[in-house]
Curated annotation (Swiss-Prot):
Sequence positions bearing Phosphoserine: S277
Protein family membership: Belongs to the Tim17/Tim22/Tim23 family.
Disease: Mitochondrial complex I deficiency, nuclear type 31: A form of mitochondrial complex I deficiency, the most common biochemical signature of mitochondrial disorders, a group of highly heterogeneous conditions characterized by defective oxidative phosphorylation, which collectively affects 1 in 5-10000 live births. Clinical disorders have variable severity, ranging from lethal neonatal disease to adult-onset neurodegenerative disorders.
Primary role: Chaperone protein involved in the assembly of the mitochondrial NADH:ubiquinone oxidoreductase complex (complex I). Participates in constructing the membrane arm of complex I.
Keywords: Chaperone, Membrane, Mitochondrion, Phosphoprotein, Primary mitochondrial disease, Transmembrane, Transmembrane helix
Any single GO BP term: mitochondrial respiratory chain complex I assembly
Subunit annotation: Associates with the intermediate 315 kDa subcomplex of incompletely assembled complex I. Interacts with TMEM70.
The name this protein goes by in its record: Complex I assembly factor TIMMDC1, mitochondrial
Length: 285
């Protein structure tokens, strides 16, 4: 069976075949899609949060801020614990150093040394061992004691949003009870009473000093917190205004660049490879 010859192409068809055939349906809506996509990606600016309740302030105390930094109160607790550990180490280590050196000299009277330097070095080694051993015992106990006391006291101050003498008494009682909890119920009660008695004069002195200065520590912190919140609120309002005007700026910039973008798109369309037509396929057949 013979295949019928292809129909002759007209002059208009031949002229149109010189241009590449492309499907540009997606290019028509490119600008609108870009605008919608940019509007969807607008940054969300949350409103700054101000803690009102006691639990919110406690979460702020033991949590981290936007820059992943701990609070100043928690940093002060850590610094105080490190300082107390060093002081306790020195307080327990120096007497132990002297006592261990004297005890070694008394117990080594009958020993024979090669020279005087060897004897002095042996005595210093014994004294250093005593300094490290007893200094460590005093150091970690003092650090833990001060950490528990400051943590309880600071937590009560932050939760109630004020300073009070009862906070020092409660902190001393809790710390003393925890330190004597291994003895039993009697040790727990006795440690709490001793801790409360020790916390009362300390709290009284600090409260008197704050009253003499005219402003408590918690009042100063509250003022600083409010000032920081107002600063964050102003910054949030400024960022919110920028975010509201951002779609208009994007749309205006797209309209300004529209002729240049159209010229680039036309040039890109003309540079695309030519699509095979039905007439060309028939010619090949």
């Amino acid at each position: 069976m013979e295949v019928p010859p292809p129909a002759p192409r007209s002059f208009l068809c031949r002229a149109l075949c010189l241009f590449p055939r492309v499907f540009a349906a997606e290019a028509v809506t490119a600008d609108s899609e870009v605008l919608e996509e940019r509007q969807k990606r607008l940054p969300y600016v949350p409103e700054p949060y101000y803690p009102e309740s006691g639990w919110d302030r406690l979460r702020e105390l033991f949590g981290k801020d936007e820059q992943q930094r701990i609070s100043k109160d928690l940093a002060n607790i850590c610094k105080t614990a490190a300082t107390a550990g060093i002081i306790g180490w020195v307080y327990g280590g120096i007497p132990a150093f002297i006592h261990a050196k004297q005890q070694y000299i008394e117990q080594s009277q009958a020993e024979i040394y090669h020279n005087r330097f060897d004897a002095v070095q042996s005595a210093h080694r014994a004294a250093t061992r005593g300094f490290i051993r007893y200094g460590w015992r005093w150091g970690w106990r003092t650090a833990v004691f001060v950490t528990i006391f400051n943590t309880v006291n600071t937590s009560l101050n932050v939760y109630r949003n004020k300073d009070a003498l009862s906070h020092f008494v409660i902190a001393g009682a809790v710390t003393g009870s925890l330190f004597r909890i291994n003895v039993g119920l009697r040790g727990l009660v006795a440690g709490g009473i001793i801790g409360a008695l020790l916390g009362t004069p300390v709290g009284g002195l600090l409260m008197a000093f704050q009253k003499y200065s005219g402003e408590t520590v918690q009042e100063r912190k509250q003022k600083d917190r409010k000032a920081l919140h107002e600063l964050k609120l102003e910054e949030w309002k400024g960022r919110l205004q920028v975010t509201e005007h951002l779609p208009e700026k994007i749309e205006s910039s797209l309209q300004e660049d529209e002729p240049e973008n159209d010229a680039k798109k036309i040039e890109a369309l003309l540079n695309l490879p030519r699509n095979p037509s039905v007439i060309d396929k028939q010619d090949k057949d």
